[in-house]
Structure formats: C-alpha cells, structure tokens
Amino acid sequence: MADTLMSDIPFWQRKTLDEMTDAEWESLCDGCGQCCLHKLMDEDTDEIYFTNVACRQLNIKTCQCRHYERRFEFEPDCIKLTRENLPDFEWLPMTCAYRLLAEGKPLPTWHPLLTGSKAAMHGERISVRHIAVKESEVRDWQDHILNKPSWAE
C-alpha cells in the first residue's frame, strides 16, 4: 500500500535532484529557451547581462535546440547544466524548475510536467519565443541587453 501511495507522488516531489534519473532530470526543463539566450559579462565587475539574442541552434518558434544531443559539436561554448554545477548558475531564471526545486519550492502551475504541454508556459510568456532575435541579425549586442546597466542607457 505504501508503495502505491509513493508512486502517486510525482518524482520531483519525492526525490532530490541528486536522486533523479537522467530522464527525470531532463524532463524538469520546461523548454523556455532562456538558457539559450546569450549573456554578456562585464570584464571589470563580472556582472552578467542578459540579452534577447538567441543561440544559433535555438529554434525560436519552438524554443528547442536544433541539435540538442550534439549541441556541443555545434556550439562549443554551450554550457551543460548538471547536478554538480547547478549552484554555479546563479543567473538561472526564477521560474527554472532546477532552481526552484534546489530552493525547496514547487513547480509553477504552468510547468509542462503539470499541464502536459508547453502551451501554458508559452501563454504565460515565460518562453523566449516572444522576445528572442536571431544572432545572425544582431549588429550591436549592447542594444539587446535586457537588464541594462546605467552606463548603457
């Protein structure tokens, strides 16, 4: 009986991030694409600035990587989020499931694991499909900083 009750509880509520299988870990990603927007770092302060410039491999409409399994071949600078390096990614969005679960918080109501699709996430405008621009179309990256520092205004 206890095993049946445990299986009724979603894995993200009964397991720690470290206990999850690779498939469970991957399924936490809501597919918003925010990780796939380029970030700029101030050379003097190490402050990170977010842009709306999409990685060349990001399909802006679907918010999915065109070559996810081979992304490091196409984009050597692509960063893989793991259980081990999660604490280093302070820039993860406040809505990120990895961040939320690491902080002991629940998944948002629009998360695909709860709704069964990405439609609610896109509807809440969490995904980048409404703001992202193609890297090939960008001339001045500073014009695309979303959290502009005072010196850039």
From Swiss-Prot:
Pfam families assigned to the protein according to its UniProt record, in alphabetical order: CxxCxxCC
Organism expressing this protein natively: Salmonella agona (strain SL483)
InterPro entries: Puta_zinc/iron-chelating_dom, UCP006173
Protein name as it appears in the record: UPF0260 protein YcgN
Family: Belongs to the UPF0260 family.
Highest taxon of source: Bacteria
